[in-house]
């Protein structure tokens, strides 16, 4: 028999052989068994049942091939909550929590807002959970991502209006007016794929990562349609790549020269947010 500590030591050895940090093996064990670190300490010398060994070994093999842990275990954390994820939607990043907070702080309690390109729904659902009186709309072009977002909304008992379609087009068709817009759209230039981690490019959905026109195509589509949906004085907040702030600011000002555009850095000192009032 093997205990949990011995199995983890074996996993750490294999993980390091593949060039990954040992913390990946540690997090995998905690997430596969949905344990805290305290749970592991309590059970580390317990013999592992055969079913648990098989379950962990299968997960470990997937991780050693580079698959993200969140896809293996089927969930990810965002702003203290757990959301179901799969390979049809991006894994939420910690930096996106900063984007969400910047937007949240600008909203009236009963505002009507939209999350464009909702993916797994983490932004829309978190905003609704934090301010329950918000009227939250979420859009995505991917039916598979929208199904995941709906499941997450049900899990968190969040009433969200989901509209499938391209950027703001579904809202224009419905005649909806907004008191706020947030979007973390696809914004990576295809040519940058060669510099990215294979864990991202092999497993996360390309449609949610990459955009035409050097990564700006979705931003441009949203910006073009803002006059049709935004109420005066309402916040517009975009998550951006680390080197996109000035270029996106120029795109906005070329279209709407009277706007005051803020470029805000994340906790790591990288440009992360473009924000302005409509």
Curated annotation (Swiss-Prot):
Enzyme type, top EC level: transferase
Residues engaged in binding substrate: 184-187
EC number, UniProt record: 2.1.1.297
Database matches in Pfam families: MTS (PF05175), PrmC_N (PF17827)
Origin superkingdom: Bacteria
BP GO annotations: methylation; translational termination
GO molecular function, one term: protein-(glutamine-N5) methyltransferase activity
SUPFAM superfamilies hit by this protein: S-adenosyl-L-methionine-dependent methyltransferases (SSF53335)
Key words, A-Z: Methyltransferase, S-adenosyl-L-methionine, Transferase
Name the UniProt record assigns to this protein: Release factor glutamine methyltransferase
Ligand binding (S-adenosyl-L-methionine): 117-121, 140, 184
InterPro entries, per the entry: DNA_methylase_N6_adenine_CS, HemK-like, N5-glutamine_MTase, PrmC_N, RF_methyltr_PrmC, SAM-dependent_MTases_sf, Small_mtfrase_dom
HAMAP family noted in UniProt: RF_methyltr_PrmC (MF_02126)
Function: Methylates the class 1 translation termination release factors RF1/PrfA and RF2/PrfB on the glutamine residue of the universally conserved GGQ motif.
Record-stated family: Belongs to the protein N5-glutamine methyltransferase family. PrmC subfamily.
Disulfide bridge positions per record: none
Catalysis: reaction(s): L-glutaminyl-[peptide chain release factor] + S-adenosyl-L-methionine = N(5)-methyl-L-glutaminyl-[peptide chain release factor] + S-adenosyl-L-homocysteine + H(+)
């Amino acid at each position: 028999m093997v205990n949990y500590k011995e199995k983890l030591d074996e996993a750490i050895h294999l993980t390091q052989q593949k060039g990954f940090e040992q913390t990946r093996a540690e997090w995998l064990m905690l997430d596969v068994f949905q344990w805290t670190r305290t749970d592991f300490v309590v059970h580390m010398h317990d013999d592992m049942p055969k079913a648990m060994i098989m379950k962990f070994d299968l997960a470990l093999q997937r991780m050693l091939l580079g698959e993200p842990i969140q896809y293996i275990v089927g969930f990810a954390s965002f702003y203290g909550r757990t959301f179901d994820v799969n390979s049809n939607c991006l894994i939420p990043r910690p930096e996106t929590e900063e984007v969400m907070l910047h937007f949240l702080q600008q909203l009236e309690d009963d505002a009507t807002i939209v999350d464009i390109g909702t993916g797994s729904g983490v932004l829309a659902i978190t905003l609704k959970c934090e301010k329950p009186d918000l009227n939250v709309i979420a859009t995505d072009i991917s039916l598979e991502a929208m199904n995941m977002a709906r499941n997450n909304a049900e899990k968190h008992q969040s009433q969200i209006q989901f509209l499938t379609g391209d950027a703001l087009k579904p809202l224009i068709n419905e005649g909806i007016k907004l008191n706020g817009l947030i979007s973390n759209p696809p914004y990576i230039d295809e040519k940058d794929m060669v510099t990215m981690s294979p864990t991202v490019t092999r497993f996360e959905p390309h449609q949610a990562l990459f955009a035409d026109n050097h990564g700006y195509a979705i931003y441009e589509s949203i910006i073009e349609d803002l006059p049709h949906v935004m109420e005066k004085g309402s916040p517009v907040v975009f998550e951006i790549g680390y080197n996109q702030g000035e270029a996106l600011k120029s795109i906005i000002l070329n279209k709407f020269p009277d706007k005051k555009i803020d470029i805000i850095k994340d906790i790591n000192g990288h440009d992360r947010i473009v924000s302005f009032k409509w």
